[in-house]
Swiss-Prot record:
It comes from Staphylococcus epidermidis (strain ATCC 35984 / DSM 28319 / BCRC 17069 / CCUG 31568 / BM 3577 / RP62A). This is Small ribosomal subunit protein bS1. Residues 361-380 are annotated as: Disordered. Transmembrane segments: none annotated. Residues 16-90, 108-173, 194-262, 279-348 form the S1 motif domain.
Length: 392
C-alpha cells in the first residue's frame, strides 16, 4: 500500500511538466523551492537558474520569490520515502525567449536589448537568453572599438533563430538602415533647389566630393567645388571638413542630390570689386584667343576681353598674329560691366602710338625712294584711257 501511494504521488508531477513554487532557501550552488501541489521540494541548480552566467544564485532570486520552471528529473529514495524535483528555470526562460523572438522575426519588428559583453567578433546581448550581434551586423558605418556599446541598450532586429543549435543572431545594422532610409526620405522631401545648407565632407572621389547633409549624402561635382579650375577635390576640401552647400537639384526617385560649394562663394568678379577701375593699366595673361579678340586673365579666374580692334594700332587679321596663350601683356581697362560681370580691355591703349606712326612713315619713305622701275606707277597706270582721243 505504501509503495502504491508513493508511486501515485510521484506520478502526479512528471518530467517535462511546468511547475511553480516559492523559493525557500538560497544556497551557494542551488535554490530550494516549495512546489505547489508537489510531494517534494524542487531543486534548481545554479546552472539552471538563468540563461546568463551567474556566480551566485542570489544574483537572480531571493527567498520568497515565486518561480516557474520545468521538471527535468525526479529523484526518489524509496527506503527513506524522500525525494526531490530537479528543475530548470533556464529551460523555461529559453523557450519563452524563442517564442518571443520568433514573433518579432515573423513581424519584422525592432526590439531593445542590453549589451552584456563585448567580444572580439561582436556583441553579446540579453534577449531572455544569450543573443549575438556579429561585427558585420553592428553598424552601417565602420566602428573600430566595439567597447563603446558595453552596457548600452541597443535597438536590434532578429536576423536568425536556430533553437536546436541554441543560436540567436541579431542585427543592429538593419535598424540603422531603416532609420537612415526614413531620414533620407524626410530630407529628400524637405530639400528644394536653391537651398543653402550645412554639411560635412564624407568622402572624396576623382570626380567630386560626397557631402553628408544630415544622414544623406549629396554630390558636389569637381566643377562645383570652386570658381577656379580644380584638378582633384583634395585641392579644395578634406574629409570631415564642415562646408556650406547649395542644392542644385534633387531627384527623389533615384535619391540623388546635386550640390555646389562654388555657388555659396563670392564670384571671382565680386572679389575684385573696388580693386580695379576704368583706365587702370594692369598686367595680365593671355589665356585664350578667338577670331574676334583675346581673353586676358587679370586676376584669378577673372578674364577680360581685348577686342581685335584693341590689340594693336596697326590692322591685324587675326589675334594670333601678335599674341599667344600664356603671354604676359599690359592692358588698360576700358570698361567694367558689373551687372553682366564683363570687362573690356585694350592692349593698344598701352602701346606708344608714335612708334606706329614712325613705322608707317618709314615704310612710305622706303617705298618712295625705291629705284626699282617695275614697282613705280606710270602715267597710264594713273590716268588710264583719258588721253587716248587727244590729238597733238
Amino acid at each position: 500500500m505504501t509503495e502504491e501511494f508513493n508511486e501515485s504521488m510521484i506520478n502526479d508531477i512528471k518530467e517535462g511538466d511546468k511547475v511553480t513554487g516559492e523559493v525557500q532557501q538560497v544556497e551557494d550552488k542551488q535554490v530550494v523551492v516549495h512546489i505547489n501541489g508537489g510531494k517534494f521540494n524542487g531543486i534548481i541548480p545554479i546552472s539552471q537558474l538563468s540563461t546568463h552566467h551567474i556566480e551566485n544564485p542570489s544574483e537572480v532570486v531571493k527567498v520568497g520569490d515565486e518561480v516557474e520552471a520545468y521538471v527535468t528529473k525526479i529523484e526518489f529514495d524509496e527506503e527513506n520515502d524522500t525525494g526531490a524535483y530537479i528543475l530548470s528555470k533556464r529551460q523555461l526562460e529559453t523557450e519563452k525567449s524563442y517564442e518571443y523572438l520568433q514573433e518579432k522575426l515573423d513581424n519584422d519588428e525592432v526590439i531593445e536589448a542590453e549589451v552584456t559583453e563585448v567580444v572580439k567578433g561582436g556583441l553579446v546581448v540579453d534577449v531572455g537568453q544569450r543573443g549575438f550581434v556579429p561585427a558585420s551586423l553592428i553598424s552601417t558605418d565602420f566602428i573600430e572599438d566595439f567597447s563603446v556599446f558595453d552596457g548600452q541598450t541597443i535597438r536590434i532586429k532578429v536576423e536568425e533563430l536556430d533553437p536546436e543549435n541554441n543560436r540567436v543572431i541579431l542585427s543592429r545594422k538593419a535598424v540603422e538602415q531603416l532609420e537612415n532610409d526614413a531620414k533620407k526620405a524626410s530630407i529628400l522631401d524637405s530639400l528644394n533647389e536653391g537651398d543653402v545648407i550645412d554639411g560635412k565632407v564624407a568622402r572624396l572621389t576623382n570626380f567630386g566630393a560626397f557631402i553628408d547633409i544630415g544622414g544623406v549624402d549629396g554630390l558636389v561635382h569637381v566643377s562645383e567645388l570652386s570658381h577656379e579650375h580644380v584638378q582633384t577635390p583634395e585641392e579644395v576640401v578634406s574629409v570631415g571638413e564642415a562646408v556650406k552647400v547649395k542644392v542644385k537639384s534633387v531627384e527623389k526617385d533615384s535619391e540623388r542630390i546635386s550640390l555646389s560649394i562654388k555657388d555659396t562663394l563670392p564670384t571671382p568678379f565680386e572679389n575684385i570689386k573696388g580693386k580695379f577701375h576704368e583706365d587702370d593699366v594692369i598686367e595680365g595673361t593671355v589665356v585664350r584667343l578667338a577670331n574676334f579678340g583675346a581673353f586676358v586673365e587679370i586676376a584669378p579666374s577673372v578674364q577680360g576681353l581685348v577686342h581685335i580692334s584693341e590689340i594693336d594700332h596697326k590692322h591685324i587679321g587675326s589675334p594670333n598674329e601678335v599674341l599667344e596663350p600664356g603671354q604676359q601683356v599690359n592692358v588698360k581697362i576700358l570698361g567694367i560691366d558689373e551687372d553682366n560681370e564683363r570687362i573690356s580691355l585694350s592692349i593698344k591703349a598701352t602701346l606708344p602710338k608714335e612708334n606706329v606712326i614712325e613705322s608707317d612713315a618709314s615704310t612710305t619713305q622706303s617705298y618712295l625712294e625705291d629705284d626699282n622701275d617695275e614697282d613705280k606707277p606710270t602715267l597710264g597706270d594713273v590716268f588710264g584711257d583719258k588721253f587716248k582721243d587727244l590729238k597733238f
